[in-house]
């Protein structure tokens, strides 16, 4: 029996492994099974070039559980005593401390950097045994034993067959790994597609009302997964079946892209466009990354363009440096090439479907839209390609490319400044009246109700030349596309003031909502009262909800305009009745107000250009008194108008109709509206 110390050139490796890799200690199974697969594949390679002439036999790798042990067994090339000394005992571990400090939270980086796959066994074991026999003719089987200290023993033993058994004596604080369900789950996670059969226990069948083991190995992996096959050999059903195996709870995918490239890097895989039902489905950890069919991670940021991390599927590449920091990964030239390649393949596939089967593309547009819009917003190269197949959808459900839509609206939706005006709605039901008003003017209205459409509108205004997007409820229909300079409202100022004061007094109090009342001549057939919302302010608030650094807008109240149509019969009747009821009370106040206004304006003109210290105190006091008097008289007038409006049910009825049209009338206010409607009828 040989005894000795492991050749570690710095501190003892085992406490380091346990300390720094504990958070990821489940990867020990991946590392040990992968090593067994490597040993098996090496034997296959030697046999193929006639350097091994013996029988290959069953090459299945077996994982088995004992009372306190896990054993991983293979029939690969095995090891001689000299090879154990070279590959197990002599660990090139110089500079370890600096590296461990840098990557102390990344088990993959430490294990992969030093080739320490085997030593991951000590993360969960108090003792490890290697019982191995080389494939070489006349080789002597040996047993290596280590209890987690730098000391080991190596002795000759009897072993009938070539290959290696690694026996882990599990630590007391890692007993979870002796549970069949735990090991089964880890094998499924890490080893489902390894290229050599992996057996864990025996298959079970129901017999006499209970499950019993059969003599057949329970092979847990698919050795030739779909992505390793040629696309020409596969049917649509093959791709769908594989998707169901990967994501059993998901709906059928929209379509898929089979990746297969050998130069200038190696990459295979299948990416699926999933059917997204809601924000909940937007999970970025659904692409599985493999290295030579060994599962590595489902965190592919930096490898896959950000907008494509929403996709599902698998990627397999030996050229992606898997065990390094994220910052290094993002600067790696191969990774950049792979990311660019994947983006190009996706855009080419989308372009192909659009060109060859536009009907199918349009049918799936609502599901594809989230991916395509995300890509256009985040990647310039993708925008340049996607603008040829990205679609607008109007409120009638018709689809247009950007170029097609510009052609459609340029004659009727160009304003006086030669801007192309894209009218849109984000809720067909709530904005129905506004949509219909626009369509009656011959305008087309887009439906932009997607999760990213707020951001898309802002981006497209920058990308599309002389183009502006305006929501249909942002103004009255005649002002949505201003084709010539408008004449000012013909209603005189005193009448506008009377109407505005009356209606403003009856507006409901709403939390974080403010109204501005105005009058406009909108024609006899226009609505008597409408509610609009400034495009700019509304858009700023919407952007504040999705973009950091704009919280100022998010905290501001919603600003709405209550627009009174001075041409409408009902508004005219309210005005005439208001003048009749209020004129006697208003007249003396108005006379006094005009006198105050005249004197105040004269004083202000007199003080123009003077420094404050040059204005007599008496004049300052008089102006201050006049300001207070003016406010007082204005309040008296408004109070009279408010008193009238409170008695005229038509005023509140018209306001409530406008609120109802905008889905802003609820609860008690809605109940009062219904009662009032019955009374008025």
Curated annotation (Swiss-Prot):
Keyword annotations: ATP-binding, Chaperone, Cytoplasm, Nucleotide-binding, Stress response
Main location (coarse class): cytoplasm
Gene3D superfamilies, per the entry: 3.30.230.80, 3.40.50.11260, Heat shock protein 90, C-terminal domain, Histidine kinase-like ATPase, C-terminal domain
Record region (Disordered): 601-620
Residue ranges, annotated region (B): 327-545
Domain of life: Bacteria
A: annotated span: 1-326
GO cellular component, one term: cytoplasm
Compartment list: Cytoplasm
InterPro entries in UniProt: HATPase_C_sf (IPR036890), Heat_shock_protein_90_CS (IPR019805), HSP90_C (IPR037196), Hsp90_fam (IPR001404), Hsp90_N (IPR020575), Ribosomal_Su5_D2-typ_SF (IPR020568)
Pfam families listed in its UniProt record: HATPase_c_3, HSP90
Region (C): 546-681
A molecular function GO annotation: ATP hydrolysis activity
PANTHER family xrefs: HEAT SHOCK PROTEIN 90 FAMILY MEMBER
Described purpose of this protein according to its UniProt entry: Molecular chaperone. Has ATPase activity.
Entry's family note: Belongs to the heat shock protein 90 family.
NCBIfam families with a match to the protein in the record: PRK05218.1
Description of how the protein assembles with itself and partners: Homodimer.
Protein name per its UniProtKB record: Chaperone protein HtpG
Gene name per UniProt: htpG
